[in-house]
Regions:
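Acidic, glycine-enriched loop/beta-strand segments at the rims
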Residues: 32-36, 42, 85-88, 98-134
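Acidic/polar loop patches that form or flank catalytic/metal-binding clefts of enzymes
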Residues: 86-91, 151-152
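Short, solvent-exposed cationic patches
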Residues: 165-168
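Active-site neighborhoods of metal-dependent hydrolases
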Residues: 1-83
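Glycine-centered flexibility motif
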Residues: 12, 69-70, 106, 129, ...
Length: 168
């Protein structure tokens, strides 16, 4: 009961040995979600001063894990609830992950990529759910990627101009 098919023909069905064999035959590209993380342990790990908010979520079209869209508001919310200031909590989702892959990003400094997210702190929240993993987080007002406005007034207005970051 801790494994669930998250995409394709058997989406939402608990994975059994029988279903696994059938899915490999009939829907070999289906993804599976393992519901094995203990929320209290995740929260405890996030509170470490060197933790980074990141996700391994994989999407297939509009199917997959809700952390695909909700990782950052959920993680920042956990840190804020634990008493971290906004700058401290945001650092766990910006400059800290960048430092971990030896990347210059995640900071507002001269020479860095123009990547900014403007949020309403009172309504910034994870809204993603199983069955609707791409539900946009609440409270995201503006997003600028590589100098291009892609979210304005909470609405997507341009194509993504982001790129995959690899350790340098």
């Amino acid at each position: 009961e801790s494994l669930e098919v998250s995409t394709g023909r058997f989406k939402g069905v608990p994975l059994t040995a029988e279903l696994f064999a059938r899915a490999r035959e009939e829907d070999p590209d289906a993804y599976v979600i393992a519901h094995v993380m203990n929320p209290e342990e995740v929260d405890l790990c996030l509170l470490h001063k060197d933790s980074a908010i990141a996700s391994d979520a994989v999407l297939r079209g509009d199917e997959g894990h809700p952390r695909a869209a909700g990782t950052f508001p959920r993680g920042i919310g956990i840190l804020r609830k634990a008493g971290l200031s906004w700058p401290e909590a945001v650092r766990h989702a910006t400059s800290r992950p960048a430092e971990m892959i030896w990347h210059r990003g995640g900071r507002i400094i001269e020479g860095a990529n123009a990547e900014l997210v403007v949020i309403d702190p009172d309504s910034y929240e994870d809204r993603g759910r199983f069955g609707a993993p791409l539900t946009a987080p609440g409270g995201v007002k503006w997003v600028v990627l590589n100098g291009v406005i892609v979210v304005e007034g909470g609405e997507i207005v341009g194509p993504s101009s982001g790129r995959i970051l690899l350790g340098e």
